[in-house]
Amino acid sequence: MTAKGELYQTADWKSEKHVPVIECPDSVAADELFEVKVTLGKEVAHPNTTGHHIRWIQLYFKPEGDKFAYQVGNYEFCAHGESVKGADEGPVYTNHSATASMKVKQPGTLLATAFCNIHGLWENTKPLSLK
């Protein structure tokens, strides 16, 4: 069995196009809705072609002190220019970006994972505190 650390890659999102970027307030009020946006290629654009694309993003929240994380959302991107005419000839492309509206009861950590069809699994985290 391969350890999680060997499957998932991470790096500074400012220099690596595969790292999920988690955008939300650093601190939120308990039980109040806020938005979390997860994107890839914020500083360095990631290709979105039939041959090289982001297939999905998943977002989790791990409450402080809890053993387990809770899935917030699963976002699939299924159109990458595929067509009967050939690769990159299709009429539609989905952008690898997802937004979730959520609320939390306690502080914790947001975890975003993403899958590139060429370069595998990537992850990033962001701490979330309460006001």
Question: What feature does the model see in each segment?
Answer:
Residues 88-99:
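Aromatic sugar-binding surface patches on proteins
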Residues 98-106:
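Short, hydrophobic beta-strand segments
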Residues 39-50:
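Short amphipathic, basic-aromatic surface patches that mediate peripheral association
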